């Protein structure tokens, strides 16, 4: 069920991006060639109706709620939604819980996607001549792309904390999450979720670093994607001050950054040596 939910979230995301892109593409003053398919013309975009994509998105979320209700009831399998630091279990036999699960699942998926875009925007904030991939990224961020870096860095933590405060109230009302003993505990949990939200940057960071290493030693062409990977990887290394960590043709900087990224998301420990995520989980478990 988790794989099915991921595939449907991906389909819903594509519908959302097409709906957004038809409104944003005419504003792009640069050359054409920035779309999900690779090219899109402003004149064509302005004439294309947007409502089918939004209607398809809403319909998909509603239909999959009914599908989860039917399939989950027959399999007697509970649906689990990873809410960052904690996982919430939903009963598929209760239809209203499946509607809530479907909406929250896509909301978290969409939020993580935009936080990935925000990360790449921060890393490449000094790039003055962006290629097609970076232009499209900046186009989707819209107003936030023009905000200062310090505000972009604060945004994931603030949004994660606020999202938990809102979701926790709803989950407690539906008895899907234990009621908190005090507002202080609720606020501390929100802060921990806010901090844990930054760990959603681990997958894109690790992916870019791995692809950067591959592209550094194997020629993979001159496509906009590989250009974006190369620029992003190089900017990451420079911003951490590791640009000179080389031995002849061997670049150790990506490996060092990968080790750091792995440590941040590690939930384990060796003696008194705790991974970054483990510290947040320990703090969460101590709250009542």
Positions of PLM-derived features:
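Selective transmembrane helix interface/packing segments
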Residues: 1-288
């Amino acid at each position: 069920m988790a794989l099915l939910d991921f595939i449907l979230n991906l389909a819903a995301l594509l519908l959302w991006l097409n709906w957004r892109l038809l409104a944003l593409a005419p504003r792009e003053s640069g050359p054409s060639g920035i779309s999900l398919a690779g090219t899109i013309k402003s004149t064509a975009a302005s004439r294309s109706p947007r409502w089918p994509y939004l209607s398809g998105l809403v319909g998909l979320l509603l239909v999959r709620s009914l599908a989860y209700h039917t399939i989950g009831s027959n399999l007697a399998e509970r649906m689990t939604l990873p809410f960052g630091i904690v996982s919430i279990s939903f009963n598929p036999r209760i239809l209203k819980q499946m509607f809530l699960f479907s909406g929250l699942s896509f909301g978290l998926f969409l939020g993580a996607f935009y936080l990935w875009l925000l990360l790449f925007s921060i890393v490449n904030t000094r790039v003055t001549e962006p290629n097609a991939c970076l232009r499209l990224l900046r186009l989707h961020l819209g107003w936030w792309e023009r905000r200062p870096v310090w505000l972009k860095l604060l945004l994931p933590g603030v949004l994660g904390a606020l999202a938990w405060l809102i979701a926790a109230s709803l989950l407690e009302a539906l008895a899907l999450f234990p009621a908190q003993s005090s507002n202080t505990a609720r606020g501390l949990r929100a802060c921990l979720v806010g901090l844990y939200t930054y760990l959603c940057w681990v997958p894109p960071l690790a992916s870019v670093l791995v692809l950067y290493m591959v592209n550094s030693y194997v020629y993979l062409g001159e496509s906009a994607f590989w250009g974006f990977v190369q620029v992003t990887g190089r900017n990451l290394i420079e911003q951490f001050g590791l640009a000179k960590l080389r031995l002849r043709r061997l670049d150790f900087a990506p490996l060092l950054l990968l080790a750091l990224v792995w440590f941040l998301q590690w939930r384990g420990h060796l003696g008194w040596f705790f991974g970054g995520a483990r510290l947040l989980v320990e703090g969460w478990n101590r709250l009542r």
